[in-house]
UniProtKB/Swiss-Prot annotation:
The gene is hifD. SUPFAM superfamilies: Bacterial adhesins (SSF49401). Residues 1-19 form the signal peptide. Residues 159-180 are annotated as: Disordered. InterPro entries: Adhesion_dom_fimbrial (IPR000259), Adhesion_dom_fimbrial_sf (IPR036937), Adhesion_dom_sf (IPR008966), Bact_Fimbrial_Adh_Pro (IPR050263). A lipid is attached at residue 20 (S-diacylglycerol cysteine). PANTHER family: FIMBRIAL SUBUNIT ELFA, FIMBRIAL SUBUNIT ELFA-RELATED. GO terms for biological process: cell adhesion involved in single-species biofilm formation. Keywords: Cell membrane, Fimbrium, Lipoprotein, Membrane, Palmitate, Signal. May be a minor structural protein required for pilus biogenesis. This is Minor fimbrial subunit HifD. It is found in: Cell membrane; Fimbrium. It comes from Haemophilus influenzae. One of its GO terms (cellular component) is pilus. A lipid is attached at residue 20 (N-palmitoyl cysteine).
Length: 216
């Protein structure tokens, strides 16, 4: 809050009354006089013109705007269909059984070194939270008790999260490394296979997943 020092207030009062010196205004006739009105206006103008002499605090705000990542999705990875072979239902008679793994990859392009290192993929499908397979969404004649599961191609067979809650950052070991500061093409390798949720019945199987490139 702006504060007016007492000495400066007194000085303003002294200067504002100088023009009324020698006048005969006093007592009750002073409060309604022209001199009184001039006195009051001069004092107010003097106080308003005074600079602020006290600062009680300060708040500094800081932030940052970052650019979008440089990576783009390779054309043949952007919208693709992975076809799994036909299998007999006997191969998927128990919950948790898998069959017919098919490899596929998603490749990024035009990444700078920093983005290639931070890039990961976030998969989302029509699944419930924590579900580690894509539900069968075939429109007609679909097989029951079976879905599609995406797993890592690193030999562990670990399923990829497909509910949009956790991204996968594991890239193929021969990609995504700095190459003399040139553009880099990191590749994400996977397998897709049938996944039984019970004794599978005969029919069509179809599932769709979307993915986003994230940087962290």
């Amino acid at each position: 809050m702006q504060k007016t020092p007492k000495k400066l207030t007194a000085l303003c009062h002294q200067q504002s009354t100088a023009s009324c010196s020698g006048s005969n205004y006093s007592g009750s006739n002073y409060s309604g006089s022209k001199c009184f009105r001039l006195h009051r206006l001069a004092l107010l103008a003097c106080i308003v013109a005074l600079p602020a002499y006290a600062v009680d605090g300060r708040v500094t705000f800081q932030g940052e705007i970052v650019s979008d990542g440089t990576c783009k999705i390779e054309t043949d990875s952007k919208n693709r269909t992975v076809t799994l072979p036909t299998v007999g239902k006997a191969n998927l008679s128990l919950a948790g059984q898998t069959a017919a793994p098919v490899p596929f990859s998603i490749t990024l392009k035009e990444c700078n070194a920093a983005d290639a290192k931070k890039a990961n993929l976030l998969f989302s499908g029509a699944v419930t939270k924590g579900q580690l397979y894509l539900s069968n969404a075939a429109s007609s004649g679909k097989a029951n008790n079976v879905g599609i599961q995406i797993v890592k191609a690193d030999g562990t067979g670990s399923p990829i999260n497909v509910d949009g809650s956790q991204a996968n950052s594991e890239k193929a070991p021969d990609t995504g490394k700095e190459q003399n500061s040139t553009v880099i093409q990191p590749r994400f390798d996977y397998f897709a296979h049938y996944y039984a949720t019970g004794a599978a019945t005969a029919g069509e199987v179809e599932a769709t997943a979307t993915f986003q490139v994230q940087y962290n």
